[in-house]
Amino acid sequence: MKLDLSAYLVIGPENCSRLVEDVIAAAVDEGFTCVQIRSKVVGAREMISVLEKAAQVIDELGKSDSVALLVNDRLDVALAAREAGIKVDGVHVGQSDIPVEVCRKFLGADSIVGLSANTEEIISAADVSCVDYFGVGPLHATDTKSDAGAALSFEKISKLVKVSRLPLVVGGGVKAEDLPALAATGANGFFVVSAVAGADNPRRAARELVDAWILSVDNSAGKPYNLRG
């Protein structure tokens, strides 16, 4: 699978007032390219159930080979889901979670392993042989991850992009109006939680974000406007 970080949805049951799989289906149908299931409140069995439903709706949209489905932190859940026949593409972990080399050992070379990082020192020192991308943030303070640290400026993100040997996806309170400046940093994409999962109309919110990102990337590259069709 070719990993596309352009539009990355992070979602769990506590983020939604509707079915998680319905929000995922709407977002993926509108152009989101990566989905991470994250929850700090539900148990392993419910996480596996959510993964199964997410994998099903992604498959029904014909995007199992182009939209990665990841699990936050829970290597055990990813492995158990795979044992149950669910297509899980990998995990995303933080600095205090299971080491990336352990994730790589158990998931295999063809799986995706993402790592949270927000300083030049961490990104420069990371063993990139075990990691596929860095998750960077927060761009703004956000209620969905209170321990995310201090907000990063666009200037700081630009510096992180320059020192990184891997693709970077940036999130933390990201809104559509942030995307032109974010695209200009050279980041490979954005991730959101509440901007889609907590929206009154998740489909419309997803469409607006995808359109804004495509337009912003085109403008940063000096291309004409290119609204998605």
Region annotations inferred by a language model:
Residues 140-142:
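A short, flexible beta-alpha/helix-coil linker loop
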Residues 144-146:
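Glycine/threonine-rich flexible loop motifs
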Residues 1-92, 96, 105-133, 149-155, ...:
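Conserved N-terminal beta1-alpha1 strand-loop-helix module at the mouth
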